[in-house]
Amino acid sequence: MNNRVHQGHLARKRFGQNFLNDRFVIDSIVSAINPQKGQAMVEIGPGLAALTEPVGERLDKLTVIELDRDLAARLQTHPFLGPKLTIYQQDAMTMNFGELSAQLGQPLRVFGNLPYNISTPLMFHLFSYTDAIADMHFMLQKEVVNRLVAGPNSKAYGRLSVMAQYYCQVIPVLEVPPSAFTPPPKVDSAVVRLVPHATMPYPVKDIRVLSRITTEAFNQRRKTIRNSLGNLFSVETLTEMGIDPAMRAENISVAQYCQMANYLSENAPLKES
């Protein structure tokens, strides 16, 4: 039997499809999401409706974003979900979540079992809409969740950690084994909750500057910042900010990255592109 077929649908590798089928795991995720009637719930990648059905049971309306044409068509004709659903058959990377929030009249509650091949770029896309999002619950590769929650001085800490924690409070919810999926992925999975900060703990003047600094620092993470960021900061400037030039990218806190970004915004602002 082909273990890529589930409920009559052949999982497409190019869409990174792995379908959740463990009832205990599904119930645990739905409990963590705790959907309520009247909320603007949005699911990314509903697939074969493993989460869509139990979430939809609790709601009058549910918005879903599904790239796979066949799966979108199945949802359209779903016996009890169909009338409740607003289906966008498109790539979530092209979705304007700000416009969607405005249409629905409130901040979005976004959830989904995300395709692992696009999870990181999709996170960055969603971070740009955090003012339109109340919270997010995602199933991700466990290694990605570890990176999202990691603090300084750890191997998992990187650009994704800094940017996620700049925008959101990041809370691990539960770990999920490969056996909970069809076909089973080759990696462990985990569910994470991301809650955009109501008030930014470390506001930056220009997010593009923070993005540039973290990219340059972590692209050369084995170098000291004296070297990796030497084109942006002198040793004297780093020292004045209380940042040791001998530290590496992984030793610098989110607050310190934001401090560096604001210094650069004030003293060498990026030109408008």
Swiss-Prot record:
Cellular compartments per GO CC: cytosol
Pfam family, one: RrnaAD
Subcellular location(s) per record: Cytoplasm
Molecular function GO terms recorded: 16S rRNA (adenine(1518)-N(6)/adenine(1519)-N(6))-dimethyltransferase activity; RNA binding
Name of the top EC class for this enzyme: transferase
Catalyses which reaction(s): adenosine(1518)/adenosine(1519) in 16S rRNA + 4 S-adenosyl-L-methionine = N(6)-dimethyladenosine(1518)/N(6)-dimethyladenosine(1519) in 16S rRNA + 4 S-adenosyl-L-homocysteine + 4 H(+)
EC number in record: 2.1.1.182
UniProt KW Cell cycle keyword: no
Family statement drawn from the similarity comment of this UniProt entry: Belongs to the class I-like SAM-binding methyltransferase superfamily. rRNA adenine N(6)-methyltransferase family. RsmA subfamily.
Protein name: Ribosomal RNA small subunit methyltransferase A
Species assigned in the record: Salmonella paratyphi B (strain ATCC BAA-1250 / SPB7)
